[in-house]
Amino acid sequence: MVFWRDIPAQVKARQGRERAARGLDPRFQEAVDAAAMRAGLTDTDHYLAEWRTSAWEERPGSPEQAADQRAAEIEAEYSAERLRAIVENGGKEL
């Protein structure tokens, strides 16, 4: 997973040399942008410094299947209210 602070932005999966990546619904990028503005992190260096990746996790299936499944889970786990609360806290989950 790729995050800006605590906001997920992309799912990545791999198996050997095979890789897959899935962007999330545009509301996640909109939340990243709004949280960055709220936190005052509008210059490139500070904005880029907040991106991080999580540890890889094992999942069954091909990288494409795993990425699709995890992306669907993330989109279901992050309601509009949850994202709004994270944005209001400058991109950090309470």
Which ranges hold each PLM region?
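C-terminal charged interaction modules
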Residues: 65-94
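Mid-chain, well-packed structural core segment of small domains
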Residues: 49-68
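Short, charged/polar N-terminal "headpieces" of proteins
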Residues: 1-19
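Residue-level marker of positions within ordered structural domains that often coincide
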Residues: 11, 33, 79
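Acidic, aromatic-enriched beta-alpha/helix-loop junctions
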Residues: 16-53
